[in-house]
Amino acid sequence: MKIKTTLCHEISEDIASINLEEIELADPAESEVQIQVMACAVNFPDLLMIQGKYQFKPPMPFAPGGELAGIVSAIGSKVTKFKPGDRVVTGMRYGGFSEAVNCPDETVKFIPGDLSFAKAASYSTAYLTAYVALTVRGT
């Protein structure tokens, strides 16, 4: 399936090295969930990866974006917990600034109740940052 994604082709101090491109996304592997991305958080590690300053160095080219929320569009043959149409959230090292992604089913969680896609996508890093600030740094 053809999707649009933002690809970083080289290390850069700004986002000048990022282009919107069309790529081929494979069908999900047997234990993967394919998610139509509805929201993707922008976090400090995304910028650090683009600048080549993050401890993890993704292979070039790569799409930034580590936290995303969306709708399950397909599942691998061994996935039993999710079905197409489910509202879900996941965390990835990179790849989220895309129209769709494939990710391991064990990294996917249901979005509770009527929580918006935007809030679900930004919850993890924001929560952990606040928690560490209050419990580790604030004491």
Region locations from a protein language model:
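Short beta-strand-to-turn element immediately C-terminal to the catalytic PLP-Schiff-base lysine
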Residues: C8, I50, S73-A74, N102-D105
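NAD(P)H dinucleotide-binding glycine-rich loop of Rossmann-like/cofactor-binding domains
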Residues: L48, R87-T139
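Residues that act as N-cap/strand-start positions at coil-to-secondary-structure junctions
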Residues: S17-L20, G95
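Conserved hydrophobic/aromatic beta-strand scaffold that supports enzyme active sites
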Residues: L20-L25, A69-I71, A100-N102, V108
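Short structural boundary motif marking the start of a folded domain
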Residues: M1-T6
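Glycine-rich beta-strand-centered segment in the early N-terminal region that forms part
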Residues: E24-A41, K53-G95, L115
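Cytochrome P450 core scaffold surrounding the K-helix E-X-X-R motif
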Residues: P45-Q51
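Proline/serine/threonine-rich low-complexity linkers at boundaries of modular beta-sandwich domains
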Residues: S12-D14
